[in-house]
Amino acid sequence: MKTEKQLARAYGELAQRLTGKRFLTASGLTRKEAAALLNREVWLEKLGRVLPIRRRVLCADVLELCRPEMERLAGSEQPEKGWLVYIYGTTSRILYPDLGPRPEDGRCRAAALFYLEVLRLVLDYEREALPFDPAYDFAFLSQEEFSGCTQAEEYRRFLEDWREQHIYQLLRLGNEATPFSTLSHIAGVHYVAMAAARGLAAAGVPVDLALVSGAAAGHDLGKYGCKPGERVPYLHYFYTDQWFTHMGLPVISHIAANHSTGDLEPENLTVESLLLIYADFRSKQERGPDGREVTRIYGLDDSFQIILSKLDNVDAKKLRRYQFVYARLHDFEDYMRSLGVDVDLTGHPAPVKELPSVVLRSNRHSSGYLRLNSASLRFRSALKV
């Protein structure tokens, strides 16, 4: 009975979405055409193949659920490189229309938008059913949590844009339609940044959690705006800023688009900027045996070595710059540790370590105290704590 209720609820949500004004306007379908895709018995059976969810959903499996309706919509127009690649490109163009039209657009686009609505529904149920995974999931702030933040209104609109522009579906599609794993990197950055931000907030440091969350989740969206032949590592910052600015989110954009290690050089960075750069530094990607990207969250020391191993034409000047970045992030991490922030991601606040009485301190204790106190004073001054 519970499964039957879930299926009926899921079907009702899908029907409401596909006959709503937003979908009809985007797809160019009439309400009658959309309703013709929603045979109740057919879709209750289809949804019953995936609900209740017990494992990670594959975009390819959802495609098979939708294929008959999609092919009916597309008619003789079929994507040259297959549906998943086409839908991935369609979703990228929702964020970045300047990528331009493709020959298959038209009825194929309506089919892709239909698929995206079904995928969104299934992924919503996946999030409800499965344990949180920092490589896949985003623990966005609830309205109650962000209502007191300075950037509450921008964050509310960011969450709306994230959902309406199918950004999470785009990230999941990228896992299967490309050899890249942008999802796990972005999700990992968001996880690290928010764990640290919450710890700082609990310790009394003024930090805008909404600003950190929006910037961390959106910091690499510009990768989807890069055109063939463009150098993604250099230009994605520009396209990230372009998307946020176009959506009217300038404050989040300023943090999200300025997350390179070079942005650490100005002395007075906001705590939100430091958190994003720190989290991005720790979430690193490597190639697995099959050539696909694998993302892991490393400690600062390991991340620094990985970065050095990937640098081209490392001269003394470039090495000094990265050593400076590493040292500054290390000071920031030490400062967070001194406040009990869970930088090791154990899920529990770290105990604040107290030094022995002055008369009992060893030379090691004293030198460590001086270094930590110096970093603490510097960050407290910079962050106006």
What are these model-predicted stretches?
Residues A152-L171:
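Short alpha-helical hairpin
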